[in-house]
């Protein structure tokens, strides 16, 4: 365990007092949750191998059960794997699995500088995948470094992050297609849908996209029925290792095309639906007459 963190935890064990101002998402009732320390579960990959073994519940994000923490923490693993900052995991674990000391009522938050450093490096990565830096990670909530908090790692003990130009997902590359190109591409694929995104997840390095069921338009569909579409799932293969600037706003509709591969609908082309754009207007009109 790093010396600074050891000293921090030793100091924390001696600092009993009010929790006012230290729990930004609502002050917990420690009259009955005083010793609610739980072992960090083995399946919690986000915080596996962190410098401490016990976490406090409720955590800094308001999660009250281990199961809830496991479910929510999993969604942040891709950000850690992007290696946007050396302390990303430390910062996230200080929120999802804050260090717990039996004799301490105070919850130990990440320092303001830790949050700011991680945000500066990782917010652009999140934005590239269509996610803004969330309000729940607002750095102004966290204490200055001269208070009791989890600090940024010393620059003497970390290696600089290598920042390579991110690879663009093949399906998201700007090909400057006109309406004829789009129509030709449709004929090469098994499906073409206009969708709005309900949920994005990452599984085994691939991006799983779940569309809104009530906001999709079907232009082409081979091998699937309307019943199948009620639980439709689209896949962007290798999505964890590439960026897709086309999806930097998941609140807008998209035109997605792709092929059925091994029972999965794999996206080969993804474009933001530009309302009023000539190519998309012609596409909507021409699709009814199309004969591939």
UniProtKB/Swiss-Prot annotation:
Its main location: secreted. One of its GO terms (cellular component) is extracellular space. The keyword Secreted applies. Residues 32-152 form the FZ domain. Disulfide bonds join 37-100, 47-93, 84-122, 111-149, 115-139, 169-242, 187-292. Residues 169-292 form the NTR domain. GO terms for molecular function: Wnt-protein binding. SUPFAM superfamilies: Frizzled cysteine-rich domain, TIMP-like. It is found in: Secreted. PANTHER family: FRIZZLED, SECRETED FRIZZLED-RELATED PROTEIN 2. The FZ domain is involved in binding with Wnt ligands. This is Secreted frizzled-related protein 2. The gene is SFRP2.
